[in-house]
UniProtKB/Swiss-Prot annotation:
It comes from the Bacteria. It comes from Wolbachia pipientis wMel. Disulfide bonds: none annotated. GO terms for biological process: regulation of DNA-templated transcription. InterPro entries: Integrase-like_N (IPR017856), TACO1_YebC-like_2nd/3rd_dom (IPR048300), TACO1_YebC_N (IPR049083), Transcrip_reg_TACO1-like (IPR002876), Transcrip_reg_TACO1-like_dom3 (IPR026564), YebC-like (IPR029072). It is found in: Cytoplasm. Residues 1-22 are annotated as: Disordered. One of its GO terms (cellular component) is cytoplasm. PANTHER family: PTHR12532:SF11, TRANSLATIONAL ACTIVATOR OF CYTOCHROME C OXIDASE 1. GO terms for molecular function: DNA binding. Keywords: Cytoplasm, DNA-binding, Transcription, Transcription regulation. Belongs to the TACO1 family. This is Probable transcriptional regulatory protein WD_0484.
Amino acid sequence: MAGHSQFSNIKHRKGAQDAKRSQKFTKLIREITVAAKQGLPDPELNPRLRSAIFAARKENLPKDKIETAIKNATGNVAGENYEEIQYEGHGPSGTALIVHVLTNNRNRTASEVRYIFSRKGGNLGETGSVSYLFDHVGLIVYKAEGVNFDDLFSHGIELEVLNVEENDKEGLHVITCEIKDFGKVRDAFYAKFGEPELARLSWQPKDLIEISDKELIDKLSALVEELEDNDDVQYVEGNFTFVDAV
């Protein structure tokens, strides 16, 4: 019976992992579709599409699925029309979150996001309720390995970006720039250093709250995880970071 139970647990875990993988693929395909619809189908001429394809390849999304998503988005194939929406809300202890979604039904998504916030000790707010706590910037991220920070920094100075910093904890180099300069800055870094790990518009907190309380960390982690488990939610940004208790 122990062996049977263990096998059942393995099957259960594999099923959960497969479901997560399938959901991730769905979100990647959705981003590729929207990116292709908004611009040219050639990734070299459409940076958002290029970034979406790069992200999809990192997650091993099959090539045929990528090509089909682009073809469906740019052809005459009837398909879903997705709307980009940003929801703002407060988490436990007054923390602030911005939830980015791609949805084909805004009423359904708003209801689901509101329910998750309320169930996890937060509340969904109105537009502008927390975004004033953030700066809206262009964000470009490279892995530290393989890219020299001094070279990135020098290039950033030439391009007059807002900031170039090292995130040793995550092993990343992070560049931020003005929204109006994002396109040219992203393309200039791509031309010199190749495709970044991440390149998008982002809400960066003006004051980052460091949280070390384990109970609060668990609550916030549960909230963010459940939000990101929603099929329509692409990603979540917040004004907090978790640190080890002293």
